[in-house]
Amino acid sequence: MTRWLFMVACLGIACQGAILRENSARNLKNSLKVMHEWKYIDYDFGSEEKRQAAIQSDEYDHTKNYPFDVDQWRDKTFVTVLRYDGVPSSLNVISEKTGNGGRLLQPYPDWSWTKYKDCSGIVSAYSIAIDKFDRLWVLDSGLVNNTQPMCFPKLLVFDLNSSQLIKQVDIPHEIAVNTTTEQGRLKSLAVQAISSVNTLVYIADNKGDGLIVYQNSDDSFHRLTSNTFNYDPRYTKMTVEGESFTVQDGIYGMALSPMTNNLYYSPLASRDLYYVNTKPFIKSEYGENKVQYNGVQDVFNTQTTAKAVSKNGILFFGLVNNTAVGCWNEHQTLQRENTDMVAQNEETLQMIVGMKIKQLLPHIVIIDIDNIINDEYMLVLTNRMQKILNNDLNFNDINFRILIGGVSDLLENTRCTNFNIQNDDSDENNDDSIRITIDASFN
């Protein structure tokens, strides 16, 4: 058993956990620890009577609820659930209550936002992102059952301090779909918050082979095309733990580097990694002579899914066939020899669909014997998508998980270690810091 230090610090309204590995040996199987797990997704309906009524009316069917993205802010952990018939709420937080399937979800901001048939609420929250101004950005695809258009796709922005809607913007049809093929499904989201006004949002259309740029300052949209967005017919078949499925999806998972302003992305049905520098978009320059797409084909030995970039420029990505999290240091040449794995587990890492890199709150530090460490941590959501698509989920098994791990621990002794960039965020003289260490053991 590996001994970990588990720290929880509270400031009345906020509690946050962080995990720090004590030894330096690489243990890929246990480098990410399970934070939450579910056999099936269930909700806090307020009472068992209301839950049974939701079941009887087909509002809730536990076999149709599949988590898709995760993020965290203070004491709130957000989970999105794709809107299928039988899904009562698409945007949720994890409650303190536990049901037979696992922790119960609560709709966010409240149940009124779950009413979607008149398009006033949230239809299907595919992806979410929280920026440095405490805003939650929500990409609502407007789709039911993953294919049926119910409403226009839209962006919603919530003030997390008040849980109030700040802005809602419908995405025009000619932006949301490929007007040549009339195909479109908006899936991945990345937010670049330069200021509270000057904020750009990048949205991937993985069926219409497009990248959409939204500028918050003037509510403008721009749709970009590139052959780097297209899926590769050679890699449409994916296999997870011996179970195969086929997809023809373009961009799946994007991540923005805070160091280089590179937006990294990969078509799901590919083994490629591409990037585009976002500085032209910041200047509202979208011409072909201004925007350059770069990358390497077949740089991975399998398809990749969700992505995230650390503050020091380490790109993390889900590796499908490997049931693993990989890494690459953007300060190194983009080639397979410079990639590595930081976590691998055949049971817990089946289809990584959500990934976030989070900063510890400024008033929270981890104390490890003689050292005070401020660090980033990673959140990973897995949902066994292969079984969802093949309709063979066993709801007596654990199917969905959120895992957590410290970034510096994950990177230790890997090819992705950044030797030239030091973490200067620690402040041992910060009298306002709360320093609480609780020993905990994990099997």
Curated annotation (Swiss-Prot):
Q: Which InterPro entries match?
A: 6-blade_b-propeller_TolB-like (IPR011042), Royal_jelly/protein_yellow (IPR017996)
Q: Which SUPFAM superfamilies match?
A: NHL repeat (SSF101898)
User: Does the keyword Transmembrane helix feature in the UniProt annotation?
Assistant: no
Q: Which residues form the signal peptide?
A: 1-17
Which body tissues produce this protein? Answer: Found in and secreted from the hypopharyngeal glands of the worker honey bee (at protein level); expression peaks at 12 days post eclosion. Expressed in the brains of adult worker bees peaking at 12 days post eclosion (at protein level). Expressed in the spermatheca of adult queen bees (at protein level); Expression levels are higher in mated queens than in virgin queens.
Q: Glycosylated at which positions? A: 145, 161, 178, 321
Principal place where this protein is found? Answer: secreted
Regulation: induction:
Unlike other major royal jelly proteins, not down-regulated by the ecdysteroid 20-hydroxyecdysone (ecdysterone or 20E).
This protein's source sits in the domain of life called Eukaryota
**What keywords would UniProt list here?**
Glycoprotein, Secreted, Signal
Q: Which GO terms describe its cellular component?
A: extracellular region
Q: Where in the cell is it found?
A: Secreted
Cited function: Component of royal jelly, a substance produced in the hypopharyngeal gland containing proteins, free amino acids, fatty acids, sugars and other nutrients, which is fed to developing larvae by worker nurse bees. All larvae are fed some royal jelly (also known as worker jelly) early in their development but it forms the principal source of nutrition for larvae destined to become queen bees. Produced in the spermatheca of adult queen bees, along with other major royal jelly proteins, where it may act as a nutrient supply for sperm stored by mated queens, or be involved in energy metabolism.
Family in the record: Belongs to the major royal jelly protein family.
Q: Would you tell me the protein name for this molecule?
A: Major royal jelly protein 7
